[in-house]
Amino acid sequence: ASGYEWSRVEDQLAQEHTVYTLDLLGCGRSEKAGITYTNFLFVQIICDFIKNVIKEKTDIIASGFSCSFVTTAAAYDKESINKIMFINPVSMISLAQTTTKKDKLFKFFIELPIFGTFIYHIIVSRETINDFFLDKLYYNPFHVDKDVLDAYYEAAHKGGYYAKCLYSSQSAKYMNINIRHAVESIDNSIYIVEGEDEPNGAAIVEAYQKVNPAIESATIPCSKHFPHIENVEAFLEQVGAFF
């Protein structure tokens, strides 16, 4: 992931808000560490950033897997986080999956110095990233921006050998956590935005609302995983209505 995904909306948001675009450890422009990344590591980073940098109660917009970090952070530190907007969050069923022996073996092989690095470079090659964006992330393939692809390619390779540690940790489910209780217990205002063509998007939103009926939602037309990139105007309209 990369903070670059917010480049099309951050200037507009900054007109009425103080905006911080945070690349978490191992992501985007941030340092790549040779560690096993976990959900709670990112929870600590988010809470520490709010406490030490922002220094006031904070509204958060998060997308994809990062939504689980924010959910846990809101349950862990109720005084730091105010309103929350999620963009296409990962399903709670998927997040509840735990690491298996097969997952641990995969992580071991990916983190091998030569063989693992070779496999990782195939997985994050320009061609693979391009195909993934076209097939999985964009509603309209003609919307794919070369600068976005370049940012994600750079993020996947920045940091040399340790660049692969985030991927190996996520693939082996070390970053997973069952957030059902957190979703149920937090009393923050939560608004889920889903792309019209996001696979299982409607079912995922329904599952969150079943656990916490106070959650509101909206669907952004002509978009998939990145409504804040593909349909900026409609996305900003939802942000303006919520915050």
Predicted regions and their residues:
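Conserved HGGG/HGGXW glycine-rich cap/lid loop of the alpha/beta-hydrolase fold
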Residues: A1-R29
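Conserved catalytic-core motifs of eukaryotic protein kinase domains, centered on the activation segment
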Residues: E5-W6, S30-T36, A96-T98, A203-I204
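Alpha/beta-hydrolase active-site loop signature
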Residues: L24-G28, S91, K224-P227
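Conserved acidic catalytic loop of the alpha/beta-hydrolase fold
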Residues: F40-T58
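Conserved hydrolase catalytic core segment
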Residues: K55-K101
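Conserved alpha/beta-hydrolase catalytic His-Asp/Glu region
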Residues: L95-Q97, H121-E184
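Conserved loop-alpha-helix segment in the C-terminal half of the alpha/beta-hydrolase fold
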Residues: S185-S223, I229
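Post-His helix in hydrolase/transferase enzymes
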Residues: I229-A241
